[in-house]
Amino acid sequence: MLNAFQLENHRLSRLDADEQGTLLDAVWVDLIEPGDDERERVQHELGQSLATRLELEDIEASARFFEDEDGLHIHSFFFYADAEDHAGNATVAFTIRDGRLYTLRERELPAFRLYRMRTRSQTLIDGNVYELLLDLFETKIEQLADEIENIYSDLEALSLVIMDGHQGDEYDNALSTLAELEDVGWKVRLCLMDTQRALNFLVRKARLPSGQLEQAREVLRDIESLLPHNESLFQKVNFLMQAAMGFINIEQNRIIKIFSVVSVVFLPPTLVASSYGMNFEFMPELRWSFGYPGAIMLMILAGLAPYLYFKRKNWL
């Protein structure tokens, strides 16, 4: 998909990207999983080469932040959660050249969608491509801050479950949720640190106007304030995991203790039975016509009753 936006009176407006020649008026060219024809069109109309999929996946700093004859290049992670609530980081390739911003990505991202919605009613302050780039980074940081707050809320709810729960399945679900939250927190941290590196590169290499230089420093301060909060999430997750495992061990030890007591209680009768067996002369049960099937039924009930009781107690 190819989207193009022009800047009129410091306000972004969408261009009809299907018309030939409209890209020349664009200040922002946004490509989402572009096909070969869209890549060729950008190359033909604007003379701009776009990053390949392999280049997007490269994690070396020299391949993610650099400047060449095709412009200033920044590859940065953006956080997302898909329809199944699976979290991930998608790389977006930013290129600034000749007063135009190019963005290339493989999927739709919440930060971009939110920024496009905001531009319908908001105007840019200085109206340049660096402000566009920094606005997108600001929107990303806001999204990451919201994600950290959501993790905090989920951890508070899990804390009550772990501290007050007495059912084994509650602990199992809590541990599974904790693992998911830890994964989300790690991806948020990776995105924060990657954005920090990208902005530091931008401040060093680009000749930012004074307004955008201050804007970049403000975003960097926001990142520095979020990183300690993100770190505390890992400490909270680790504490709750250890607490849950401790309660599970206590519960297992209690169950094993009950089994041990039951075994000890039945050990003396078993010892007597094994010593004397069924070797007495006077045994009225030997004359019962239903003695054998009755004994079989008694054995089945004797084995089934403890099983059902232990199952009801969630010991099995």
Swiss-Prot record:
One of its GO terms (molecular function) is nickel cation transmembrane transporter activity. Keywords: Cell inner membrane, Cell membrane, Ion transport, Magnesium, Membrane, Transmembrane, Transmembrane helix, Transport. The chain crosses the membrane at residues 258-278, 290-310. GO terms for cellular component: plasma membrane. The keyword rRNA-binding does not apply. The record marks 253 as: Essential for ion permeation. It catalyses: Mg(2+)(in) = Mg(2+)(out). Coiled coil: none annotated. It is a multi-pass membrane protein. It comes from the Bacteria. Signal peptide: none annotated. It is found in: Cell inner membrane. A motif (Probable selectivity filter) lies at residues 277-279. The central ion permeation pathway is formed by the first transmembrane domain from each of the five subunits. Mg(2+) binding strengthens interactions between subunits and leads to the formation of a symmetrical homopentamer surrounding a closed ion permeation pathway. Low Mg(2+) concentrations trigger both a conformation change within each subunit and a loosening of the interactions between subunits. This results in an open ion conduction pathway. In addition, this results in a less symmetrical shape of the whole complex. Homopentamer. In the absence of Mg(2+), interactions between subunits are weakened, and dimers, trimers and tetramers can be observed in vitro. Belongs to the CorA metal ion transporter (MIT) (TC 1.A.35) family. Mediates influx of magnesium ions. Alternates between open and closed states. Activated by low cytoplasmic Mg(2+) levels. Inactive when cytoplasmic Mg(2+) levels are high. This is Magnesium transport protein CorA. The lineage of its organism: Bacteria, Pseudomonadati, Pseudomonadota, Gammaproteobacteria, Enterobacterales.
